[in-house]
């Protein structure tokens, strides 16, 4: 049975009033598919793994055969009808707590929290829960449901006055005084673990970071001393020496930043992602992305997959101070031998999550050369930055045709049309030009600055902003000017651009113009975001006095 929408309608007569937000306990989407339940193991003979790519920030309630609520313990992979089941890493709230935030984790490849996101939870009157679930960044992820034990079916209503339901060790009594929920031991002093605590069903376990192992007490960690101990923490080969040891990777793989894990090399370009997988890993397998029409191409030694940020099922999301683009490479046995001579297979399935991260905050520079004598003004050529923006100089206020090869000719006080343009037009994102300032040199930290935009507000009355159909593009008009002094013959523009999720009502982009008097109000502050400076020019231009 497909999910259905339960809505409560509110009719008000008389004078107009402000809109009333519906209580999520009475306005939610039911998730009732049997395959969501934690008892449902993935059987690909009955169909491909499932994915919650339709989930997109709405409120949901688990009902029917899906279960009563989300599990609060680690679910093994290949359950809930998918490869990477998603569970709630935290206890359910009480009714008086209102809406709370919890971490949701996806289990895969032996890691109970290989991927995580933040969801919202509310306890409703009647003893059930509703969840505001975010869209997973990659497939195959599914939010799981679970049937919790009933301690005594006859224990209901006033029976609590005469007797008390008791739950098994590792579980606690729920707000309905009847259901036994899993106890999250990790919420109390991290379960006594010195590093990582993983909540399990009716229990928990301690884990250690890469290159470290548990001591005999099962709670504290120690450094790996050599290859004889857990292979040195290396995912593949461990090479010992008199001075210690180091991890090595098979040909075609690269060592990740933790210096212990080997991974497939991924090239994050400004408008595309490229994955090169050694053929030894994929012999006999056919590789494809989330959109199965996007497939790998073999060059004899590697299988190459090239895809853009808005095709092949790529999911682009804003996570903290980064823009994250994700996809999943899946390898399944070929139906017939390939032209490259693959007659055998050594694995039944290959799954490679692919992620590229880009900073949210950018500083983009562009320059021009003003002429005091009202003779032609030459605009410096544009400079590309890293994903996702460039600063373009346009020919008119239609902002459709930027100057490409031929430089424009302008005079002082003529109109200069410039704009922030995304390299790739990705839906679900929006931008805010937080500041734009001019300098007489290409240095961003130049002492002499003239602000056109500051704190998201136009600070020069001569600046005009135009509306754009694209949430990421911003267009402006300003009269051409120069700095005082005969030596100041160049002007450079620098713009700080911030990227946000278009549905995030508390983001810095949603706040817009942010005067200093408003700082400290609720919502996101871009001061804590990691920024990246994109250098541009200058291109030297002959100057005639």
Curated annotation (Swiss-Prot):
What subcellular compartments does it reside in? Nucleus envelope
Q: Which residues form the ZP domain?
A: 261-516
Q: Which UniProt keywords apply?
A: Calcium, Disulfide bond, EGF-like domain, Glycoprotein, Nucleus, Signal
User: Has UniProt tagged this entry with the keyword Disulfide bond?
Assistant: yes
Query: Organism's domain of life?
Result: Eukaryota
Q: Which organism is it from?
A: Homo sapiens
Disulphide bonds in the chain:
186-197, 193-206, 208-221
The segment annotated Disordered runs over: 518-545
Whether Phosphoprotein counts among this entry's keywords is no
Q: Where is the signal peptide?
A: 1-22
Q: What is this protein called?
A: Oncoprotein-induced transcript 3 protein
Q: Which residues are glycosylated?
A: 89, 116, 291, 299
Any single GO CC term annotated in Swiss-Prot or TrEMBL for this entry: extracellular space
One Pfam family this sequence matches: Zona_pellucida
Domain EGF-like, first and last residues per copy = 182-222
Q: What is its main location?
A: nucleus
What this protein is reported to do is described as: May be involved in hepatocellular function and development.
Gene Ontology molecular function terms on file: calcium ion binding
* Any GO BP annotation: renal system process
What does the record say about tissue specificity?
A: Liver-specific. Expressed only in the hepatocytes. Down-regulated in hepatocellular carcinoma (HCC) and HCC cell lines.
